Amino acid sequence: MTQNSQGRRGRPTNEALGQTIVDAAYKLFVELGFQATTLDKVAQRAKVSKLSIYRHFESKEALFSAAIADRCHQFAPQMFSESIDGSAEVQLLAVGSSLLRTLLSPDVRSVEAMVMADKKSQKSLSKLQYEGGPAYVIAQIEALLRQLHKNEVLDVPDPVASARLFAALFKGSDLLIIARFDPARAEDSKEIDSYCTSAVAMFIAAHGAKSEATA
């Protein structure tokens, strides 16, 4: 969770304090944006000293990366634990639904909007956001697809490419655009369930079981 788990001088850092800093920073990034969020403001919000922040994170960029990764890691375990049992459809539906609901959450959309609006640091922030969030989720999806392929449930010869395509089905949902002007509709459970069911059905149709593919 923290960047400097052993601290700058080899001493273990306080993990609970590090989490407090990350939580405060994430809220400020969402509220104020990257440029307006300073380490002084983070220290004030977290009720810690600025020195305490530097004991955990080398820079504001490192803190931003940790905040994005922490947010992602909070929902990812639940997303994939829900998909342990059941058919391929049930497992993928659990993952896809959790992913889309997370993408639709106000704070995630706010961070994305903040990154896109930050012309000064957009490139570097986009890289940090990708590494802390999407890249991690895609890796988890890849692992699930490898298992489904190994068990001959689905035919997934290229798990990396298929994981990226699966994630794109939800990242590319029109509900993310609709959320900008009609959030009630975009966040409606029936709308989300309908979209996810169709997306998963299409993905499974493109990755038929090995036995079917060789028949």
Task: Please place each PLM-identified region on the residue numbering.
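Amphipathic alpha-helical linker/stalk segments
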Residues: 65-95, 103, 107, 146-150
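Helical hydrophobic small-molecule/effector-binding pocket
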Residues: 69, 90-125, 170-176, 205, ...
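C-terminal alpha-helix
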Residues: 144, 198-210
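Amphipathic alpha-helical packing segments from all-alpha helical-bundle domains
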Residues: 90, 101-102, 106, 110, ...
